[in-house]
């Protein structure tokens, strides 16, 4: 069976927590500081880390067993977020291979941007402090009326880059990332190097499942160069 060649992307969009950056240490520190101030023992890091992509909801759920809408949640959320805002880039770092991958995308002539559900009060200072200041666009969880898995943030990112959604790929480590990307009409990549949460990424129906940032760069490079070769042969 003959299949159409894969169109080359013009931009790669990324989730932030668990995709570009390992922010779990600072998120865990913020929730455990809240516990310490209440005289409670810390929640083990290996329990907190897998929930990092879910932000406050994940941290509070894992540490206190309290969910949004339940009694006490909003007070816990306020305390956690205040702690996090005061120390959001102490231990957070880009994952190994991310800087080289981003440089490689730029060398291929591709734009790249960040689309996260993290609120702008945290996103804006964080991206500057951990080395993501060159992003072509940064869309936070409160930039649009609806966060992911709604497609609106991804569509806004494409608009800001002056690109059609189908010219963009979206890379994330959570099921909602893949749902948002598909709803926006973008090709989707699940990154297995991230936190990934309770549902295994092979069940997310992503177009690609990759283990390393280098694998992403290699895939994009192959697709871009194949498209360039087709243009030359036309």
Q: Model-found features: residue ranges?
A:
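N-terminal helical cap/lid subdomain that shapes the substrate entry/recognition surface
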Residues: 5-100, 106-108, 121-124, 132
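Proline-centered loop/turn at the N-terminus of a beta-strand
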Residues: 111-113, 187
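Asp-based, Mg2+/Mn2+-dependent phosphohydrolase catalytic module
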Residues: 1-10, 106, 120, 124-234
């Amino acid at each position: 069976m003959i299949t159409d060649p894969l169109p080359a992307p013009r931009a790669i969009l990324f989730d932030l927590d668990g995709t570009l950056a390992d922010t779990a240490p600072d998120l865990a520190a913020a929730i455990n500081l809240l516990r310490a101030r209440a005289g409670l023992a810390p929640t083990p890091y290996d329990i907190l880390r897998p929930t990092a992509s879910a932000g406050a909801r994940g941290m509070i759920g894992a540490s206190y067993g309290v969910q949004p809408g339940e009694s006490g949640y909003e007070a816990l959320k306020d305390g956690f977020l205040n702690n996090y805002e005061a120390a959001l880039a102490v231990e957070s770092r880009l994952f190994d291979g991310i800087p080289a991958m981003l440089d490689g995308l730029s060398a291929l002539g591709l734009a790249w941007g960040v689309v996260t559900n993290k609120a702008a009060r945290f996103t804006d200072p964080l991206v500057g402090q951990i080395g993501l200041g060159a992003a072509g666009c940064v869309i936070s969880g409160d930039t649009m009326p609806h966060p992911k898995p709604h497609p609106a943030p991804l569509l806004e990112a494409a608009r800001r880059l002056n690109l059609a959604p189908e010219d963009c790929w979206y890379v994330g480590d959570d099921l909602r990332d893949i749902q948002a990307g598909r709803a926006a009409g973008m090709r989707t990549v699940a990154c297995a190097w991230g936190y990934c949460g309770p549902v295994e990424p092979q069940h997310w129906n992503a177009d690609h499942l990759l283990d390393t940032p280098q694998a992403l760069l290699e895939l994009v490079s192959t697709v871009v160069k194949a498209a360039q070769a087709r243009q030359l042969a036309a």
